[in-house]
């Protein structure tokens, strides 16, 4: 039986966090999952801010491709009610990430608020 890798940082782990699942984020997450071995990525994490019923299939598809769902702590239960199983909350995902790719319109604002602290 193959041992499951942890999502938390280690000396040799490489975790990529993609923020946003829109026009840019969704295909990027899929591409990173497809090229994980070639790019030496251990985990592709993706953050989804809002649980939307019409995006359940999109989130499930990304998880099926091997991506790890990350949500805000205050939305965790809302995602679970929709049938999702988030594996991390945003605070832990940011600390585990070696690379953060923000695909949201608020990316520049997030840089000042979140990423400069990293």
Question: Residue locations for each model-derived region?
Answer:
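A short, basic/flexible loop-to-alpha-helix module at the beginning of a structural domain
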Residues: 1-14, 90-91
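A general structural motif
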Residues: 11-13, 41, 96-97
